[in-house]
Amino acid sequence: MEKLNHPAILVVDMLNDFVTGSLACDRGKAIVPATTSLLKAAREKGVPVIFCNDCHLKGIDFELKLWGDHAIKGTPGAEVIPELELCDKDYVVPKRRYSGFFQTDLDILLKELGVQTVVITGLHTHMCCRHTSADAYMLGYDVVVAKEATNAFTEEDYVNGLAYLKTCYGADAYSNEELIAAF
């Protein structure tokens, strides 16, 4: 694997409600150690870490009709899980739709940071990671996936999500070891 071209880590929906709360799944818990170690290495190497967090308005966001209340703005469920140790130099981009880019400041933040490659981590490869990757690709970013730091509700969703990202956006999936060496 070649060095990544001006990378940033995008951490998608690693929130209390997705890992231990209303939309919890064991597969979300399973990626916490790998995500933690990847973020630690990225921070040590000066790679920006950006959290793309669901942050819904109760009673307004139509997504809540499909998924029920989750990640409601101002609640503990909308907070980054403590294991990931959100720090002062990290960035947080709240989102009200699946994509971290849709009507948020993510694109301008990445441009101001000089980012050219986004490393996708978090939940879920077939949903929010997929839509964030799609918009990243359409905006001209290179997209790669941290295969040990992403997951989905089921193995089938995870595998199909990775395959879709590869087929549609050329997003190769790499191990933490490979990614850290490429920072």
Whereabouts are the PLM-identified features?
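Short glycine-enriched, charge-decorated loop/helix-capping segments at active-site entrances
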Residues: 22-29, 65-71
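Short acidic, Gly/Ser-rich segments with clustered Asp/Glu that frequently serve as metal-coordination loops
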Residues: 17-21
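Short active-site segment of divalent metal-dependent hydrolases/proteases
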Residues: 16, 57
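Metal-dependent catalytic neighborhoods of phosphoester/phosphodiester hydrolases
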Residues: 60-64
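Active-site flanking residues adjacent to catalytic metal/cofactor-binding acidic residues
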Residues: 12, 53, 147
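Acidic-leg catalytic submotif of subtilisin-like serine proteases
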Residues: 8-14
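A short alpha/beta connector and helix-capping loop motif
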Residues: 5, 24-55
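Active-site-adjacent betaalpha module
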Residues: 1-8, 36-45, 68-183
